[in-house]
């Protein structure tokens, strides 16, 4: 057999393993676990770091103010050096909509070694400790909107399962062409890297969270020493989950039904920056890991369609059949995520093209890192950030 046949056979074998051996990552049925309401509702501090988020807050903050929570809950919005009137708008929205109590404050510029977001989270948690007796923190991004019962259901899940961290991957916006092409694949690749079922096993080595929506027990945060212990992490959600688990905490991660992002990504550029800003940090800035990742993406996602085309042109049946089988398994595993995002299953066929884009984003992330522009976000650049300690 020639080289293409061998490589295609390897790709097919990889897909058979991914289908059964990677924690059934492709299934989308991991939602909040069975839960019952606590006898006495614990108090919660909702911490929202925000930097130039005025546009998103118009849709997201009213949903937090309107939380139907039987216990005490307060919102601490940390204005991280915004220039678009984020803090002023937040106060105006609170006055207009009423609901939960809102405190808006600013921590000043981050100290050396801190990322801006974690510096803001630190400030919000400190305010909550000083002003409330909160037993839980809800850490949620400024672009994340919550259904009225979101907080109640998160707390019920944590209470029922004796969980220290409950995280939901918010349903991202899918409306524009590039959003439909990129976003479902983004969540699919995340689940492939961090299979939810595997993460949710007590004591599992695989650990992650989704930073847009994290309910964290205060005692667990103090035991884990967060956010101080992860102050330089760009991939802060994964770092947070690892710190909590290392300290003996129990975590849960799944897909959201009541939480969604309001942030639009109307073109390829914003989506590209979202992925590339942290892709190389995820690989811990190691060139050999980068090379292996690129090679793996090529073999797993790009070889099947190449083998089909080459086999059809040359009349070589073996790579054609093996490539078609690998491509079919690939597409089949992507269909549940497309359905979760209410997209046509036919889009699964173009997953190799989307994977190629992600490969290029990863390469670009490394290039920007070595140019001193790694992890650029919201006007800040972290030349050599930590990934997830």
Where are these regions (language model features)?
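Catalytic donor/gating beta->alpha subdomain of glycosyltransferases that bind UDP-sugars
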Residues: 158-192, 219-222, 226-290, 375, ...
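Membrane-embedded multi-pass helical conduit in multi-pass membrane proteins
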Residues: 290-372
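Cell-envelope/extracellular polymer assembly enzymes that use nucleotide-activated donors
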Residues: 42-45, 74
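A conserved acidic beta->alpha catalytic loop
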Residues: 70, 79-89, 108-110
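Short, acidic, metal-binding catalytic loop of nucleotide-sugar glycosyltransferases
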Residues: 62-72
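Acidic donor-binding/catalytic loop of UDP-sugar-dependent glycosyltransferases
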Residues: 85, 140-157
């Amino acid at each position: 057999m020639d080289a293409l046949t061998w490589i295609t056979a390897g790709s097919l074998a990889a897909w058979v393993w991914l289908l059964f051996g990677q924690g059934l990552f492709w299934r989308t049925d991991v939602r909040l676990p069975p839960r019952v309401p606590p006898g006495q509702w614990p108090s919660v501090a909702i911490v929202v770091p925000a930097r130039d988020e005025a546009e998103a807050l118009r849709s997201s903050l009213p949903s937090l103010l309107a939380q139907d929570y039987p216990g005490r809950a307060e919102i601490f919005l940390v204005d991280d050096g915004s220039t678009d009137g984020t803090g002023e708008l937040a106060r105006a929205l609170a006055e207009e909509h009423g609901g939960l109590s809102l405190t808006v404050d600013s921590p000043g510029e981050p100290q050396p070694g801190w990322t801006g977001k974690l510096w803001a989270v630190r400030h919000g948690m400190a305010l909550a400790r000083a002003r409330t007796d909160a037993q839980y923190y809800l850490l949620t991004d400024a672009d994340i909107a919550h259904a009225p019962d979101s907080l109640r259901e998160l707390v019920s899940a944590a209470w029922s399962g004796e969980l220290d961290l409950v995280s939901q991957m918010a349903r991202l916006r899918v409306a524009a062409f590039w959003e439909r092409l990129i976003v479902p694949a983004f969540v699919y690749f995340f689940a492939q890297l961090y299979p939810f079922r595997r993460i949710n096993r007590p004591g599992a080595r695989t650990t992650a969270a989704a930073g847009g929506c994290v309910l964290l027990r205060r005692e667990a945060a103090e035991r884990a020493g967060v956010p101080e212990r992860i102050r330089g992490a760009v991939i802060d959600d994964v770092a947070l989950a690892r710190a909590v688990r290392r300290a003996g905490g129990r975590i849960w991660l799944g897909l959201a039904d009541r939480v969604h992002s309001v942030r639009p990504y109307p073109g390829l550029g914003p989506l590209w920056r979202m992925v590339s800003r942290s892709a190389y940090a995820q690989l811990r800035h190691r060139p050999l890991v980068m090379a292996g990742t690129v090679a793996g993406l090529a073999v797993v996602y790009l070889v099947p369609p190449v083998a089909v085309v080459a086999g059809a042109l040359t009349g070589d049946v073996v790579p054609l059949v093996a490539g078609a089988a690998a491509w079919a398994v690939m597409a089949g595993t992507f269909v549940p995520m497309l359905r979760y995002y209410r997209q046509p299953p036919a889009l699964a066929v173009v997953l190799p093209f989307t994977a190629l884009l992600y490969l290029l984003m990863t390469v670009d992330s490394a290039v920007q890192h070595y140019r001193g522009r790694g992890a650029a976000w919201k006007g800040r650049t972290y030349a050599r950030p930590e990934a997830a300690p």
